[in-house]
Amino acid sequence: AAHWSDWIGNFIDWVEDMDEDKRIVIENLTTRYPGTEQPQLRQINAEVHTGQVVGIIGNSHSGKSTLCHVLAGVIPKIVSAEIEGDWHMFGQRVSDNWPVYNAMNGVVLQNPAGQLSGLADTVADEIAFDLINQGMAEGLIQKRVEEVATQMGLIEQLNLRPESLSGGQIQRLAIATAIVANPAVLIMDDPTSEMDPLGRRQFFQWLAQVKETTVFIVTSEIDDLCEVADVVWVLHEGQMVAQGRPGEVFNHLAADWQIPAPTIQQLAQKMDWHLADGRYPVNDADLKEVRYAHN
């Protein structure tokens, strides 16, 4: 009983702090796996406001997945690693409040099939799994499952077995299970890698409509990311080498980061179209502003 009263007390404190401090702050985060000499993350410092979409990009082995694992609590709770530094959410030290934080986040990692419960007979049951465990009323569960399935384009698959789905549908199912309980933080590591172009476009259209939830997303879909991200973080060899709004980051890429410029930016460079501050446009909104100025 004492354990649950402590948990509830910490949860109430955290929710109250949300109104006072709406930031997520990472301070001097360094992560090293056992048996490795070099850290996978080195002195990461960043700050975002709640409700923002944060795009995490970088080449292979830059530390993107490791950062996701830390943010999700996979490191060190499931995967062993040495961590220095810390991060705070809504003014609370996350490492001191793991049970509370885990109840407030949703996670989609690179192996979405491995995240499914394996206990559900249907897609609907899989989406409902966490809500059932929370003791939600059956009618409310059905309503919420249908809402999330509609958002993820799975409404026609609700009565199918999860293992019968395609790779892209499995990814959408994993996202559905991650968002069904309305998490405060959503962490997604390459969530569209197996989706077809239509599925990917629908996913990013959905992401553009997400409000209040803070989203961390690793993706190589640069064009789509520029349309939805409030902030972009660039990792290179375990270090945060750039962070800022998409237009700021992509107009100052270093060659050794090996990150392609967005298609719109490449077009604008060929046409020599600039925004008023001299930057090249990187998304549709920027491009419309530039074309209006040139007409």
Tell where the protein language model's regions lie, with residue ranges.
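The feature captures the beta-strand-to-loop junction immediately N-terminal to the Walker
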Residues: 57-59
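ABC ATPase NBD Q-loop/coupling interface
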Residues: 84-100
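Conserved ABC ATPase "signature" region
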Residues: 139-157
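Conserved ABC ATPase signature
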Residues: 161-165, 169
